[in-house]
Swiss-Prot record:
HAMAP family: FdhD
Function in brief: Required for formate dehydrogenase (FDH) activity. Acts as a sulfur carrier protein that transfers sulfur from IscS to the molybdenum cofactor prior to its insertion into FDH.
Gene encoding the protein: fdhD
Location within or outside the cell: Cytoplasm
Name of protein: Sulfur carrier protein FdhD
One GO CC term on file: cytoplasm
Length: 278
């Protein structure tokens, strides 16, 4: 297995496909011309030789995705419990082959169920609706964020969406430092996958990534709140709205949830005590 921080083995340098498409502009159906379309491929996460889940995703940053998914789904508690990863082609997509510690693999097998994911779905494969909510330890109140610094982050969020700029087809998730500077970010055709990539990246970065908040370009679903809380993220900013279940989960696990983030304004759903307004 490769070191978990090494480059992925696939030489994937282009995450769009050019296709002949007809364009309509003000009652004029133009001749087909080349346009960019985002790639979306099945990605299987395979733990110690056993396929656990297949998600539809953009074919990049997949080791970060696998790390973030493993943490946010409670498969592992620490990056040290994954000994290595390889990304390899499979018949119709890609596999991330994960070398998981024996103790964690036994736990995974004990709870394993048929789980087939798809973009934007957090319930797929869950046997009982009561199993949707995962037990999450209430978050501490150790973080604060000055809302006056949010504008800077919003201005640069699309810097982490190069494929999105070409296709208009990706979501972004970025880590916002207390200063408003973006430490890093990831994009994907699936908003949950983009967040998992960010959470996986954060888990393997240095101490500077412990301070700050997550920012997503999409709405905030209950699953995104739950994933953030599972990884110790205390503040989640979303460009769009939050759902009722997301608000309920955020309230219960002490996560500060903020939606409709625009320059100079935002809607604070839960736990505003972490936020400073200049």
């Amino acid at each position: 297995m490769n070191n978990i921080l090494s480059e992925e083995v696939l030489n994937v340098t282009d995450f769009t496909t050019s296709r002949q498409l007809a364009l309509w502009k003000r009652e004029d159906l133009q001749s087909p011309q080349l346009d960019d379309v985002a790639e979306e491929v099945p990605v299987a996460l395979v733990y110690n030789g056993i396929s656990h889940v297949v998600m539809m995703a953009s074919p990049k940053d997949l080791t970060h995705f696998a790390m973030g998914f493993s943490l946010s789904e409670g498969i592992i508690d620490s990056p040290r419990e994954i000994y290595g990863m390889d990304v390899v082609p499979s018949c119709n997509g890609l596999e991330v082959q994960i070398d998981l510690s024996s103790r964690r693999f036994m736990g995974l097998k004990a709870r394993r169920r048929a789980l087939a994911g798809r973009t934007g779905c957090g319930v797929c494969g869950v046997e009982q609706l009561n199993d949707i909510g995962k037990p999450v330890q209430p978050l501490p109140f150790s973080q604060t964020f000055n809302l006056g610094n949010l504008d800077r982050a919003l201005k640069h969020l699309n810097d982490f969406q190069p494929t999105g700029k070409l296709t208009g087809c990706t979501h972004a998730a970025a880590w916002v430092m207390p200063s408003g500077e973006l430490a890093g970010g990831h994009e994907d055709v699936g908003r949950h996958v983009a967040l998992d990539k960010l959470l996986g990246r954060r888990a393997t970065e240095g101490e500077e990534w412990r301070q700050g908040a997550a920012l997503v370009s999409s709405r905030a679903s209950y699953e995104m709140v739950q994933k953030s809380a599972m990884c110790g993220v205390e503040i989640l900013f979303a460009v769009s709205a939050a759902t009722t279940l997301a608000v309920d989960v955020a309230e219960r696990c002490n996560l500060t949830l903020v939606g409709f983030c625009k320059p100079g304004r935002a809607t604070i759903y839960t736990h505003p005590q972490r936020l400073i307004a200049d």
